[in-house]
């Protein structure tokens, strides 16, 4: 993938495989040490030995995958770059920030805005969705929350879908790879990166979050 930009071309006489756990490296390590699991995708780009898929699956088992599913290098790259820019990280930051800012603009306190936007989602609702599915959440919440969530979900889908379509196209046409390589190749990469992440850390929402997290009982 994107070999014209990366210059990475594998030798013709070796198996080329991948095993991609569906989580951050930190999560994979933590779950592995706890004897828990995370799912992984596996793919074969080049099978010289006739055992490439077997090796990829073995790698998935070795890192503690709950189950593995087969994909292709292309689909894995596209879905990975797309996902981390969308619902996994970029989209979360953007959605949290938008909701928080609207609450603050309408007179809600920083603590209330953060708790109603981030804390409740991350500490309570998202883990329940992970364990039981979204349909469970609709059935387990109040009738007020249920009706509102059912009504507004299509609105968010309609608003977000064009953004996700532009994002996927940017991944597919190589724009995201190009931008990443250019940014990561700068002599000032670390300084520039720190400036961007420091700006996020300095947003009121996440400054409030730092305080809220410190007040959790399990932090004491």
Placement of each model-derived feature along the sequence:
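NAD(P)-dependent Rossmann-like dehydrogenase/reductase catalytic/cofactor-binding core
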Residues: 36-39, 43, 47-51, 55, ...
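Rossmann-fold dinucleotide-binding core
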Residues: 1-85
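A contiguous, surface-oriented mixed alpha/beta subdomain in the mid-to-C-terminal portion of proteins
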Residues: 80-81, 85-88, 92-96, 109-113
């Amino acid at each position: 993938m994107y070999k014209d930009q990366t210059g990475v071309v594998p030798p013709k006489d070796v198996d080329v495989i991948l095993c991609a756990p569906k989580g951050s490296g930190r999560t994979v390590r933590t779950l592995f040490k706890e004897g828990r699991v995370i799912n992984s995708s596996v793919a074969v780009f080049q099978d010289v030995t006739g055992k490439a898929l077997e090796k990829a699956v073995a790698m998935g088992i070795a890192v503690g995958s709950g189950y593995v599913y087969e994909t292709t290098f292309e689909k894995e790259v596209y879905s990975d770059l797309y996902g981390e820019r969308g619902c996994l990280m970029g989209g979360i930051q953007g959605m949290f920030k938008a909701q928080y800012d609207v609450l603050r603009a309408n007179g809600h306190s920083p603590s209330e805005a953060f708790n109603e936007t981030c804390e409740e989602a991350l500490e309570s609702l998202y883990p329940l969705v992970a364990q039981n599915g979204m349909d469970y959440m609709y059935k387990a919440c109040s009738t007020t929350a249920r009706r509102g969530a059912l009504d507004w979900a299509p609105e968010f889908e309609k608003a977000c879908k064009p953004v996700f379509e532009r994002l996927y196209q940017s991944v597919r046409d190589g724009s995201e790879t190009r931008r990443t390589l250019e940014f990561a190749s700068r002599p000032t990469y670390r300084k520039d990166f720190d400036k961007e992440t420091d700006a996020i850390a300095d947003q009121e929402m996440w400054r409030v979050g730092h305080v809220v997290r410190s007040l959790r009982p399990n932090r004491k």
